[in-house]
Amino acid sequence: KITSNSPDHESLKKLRVELEKIPGLAVVSTVPTDIEITSINAQKGSSLLDYAKKDGLKPEEIIAIGDSENDYSMLSIPGIHSVAMENACDMIRNICVYQTRANTRDGIAYIINCILADRENFKL
C-alpha cells in the first residue's frame, strides 16, 4: 500500500483521477487529506474472502465493521453482515445493513454486545 498526504485537496483529487485510470489499482481516501493506493487484489474484501474460504466460512457467517472508503470492498460483499460505525462516511453508511456507535463511543464493543444479547434473532 502506498499512502500520500497533502493539505491540497484539489491536487489529491487530480492525482486520484489519473491513478484510477491504471488497471489493477484500487484508489481510496480515508480522509480528505490522504489517498491510499493498493493492488485490487490486496483490498480488505478480497483478503477477507480468502480467509473465509480457508476456514470454510460463508459470507452469511461473517460480520465486518468499517467507517471509511478503504472498508468498501469488505463491507459490500454480498451476504455479509456489514456494520457502519456512526462516524462512517456516507459511502459506507449507505451500503451497510447495520450501524453501531462511533469509534469514540466503543462502537465495536457495542455491536458485539448487541449480537451476544440477542443471539436468537441475530443468526450467523
Can you describe what each PLM-predicted range is?
Residues K1-I65, E69-I77:
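Conserved acidic, metal-coordinating active-site core of Asp-based
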Residues S82-L124:
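Asp-based, Mg2+/Mn2+-dependent phosphohydrolase catalytic module
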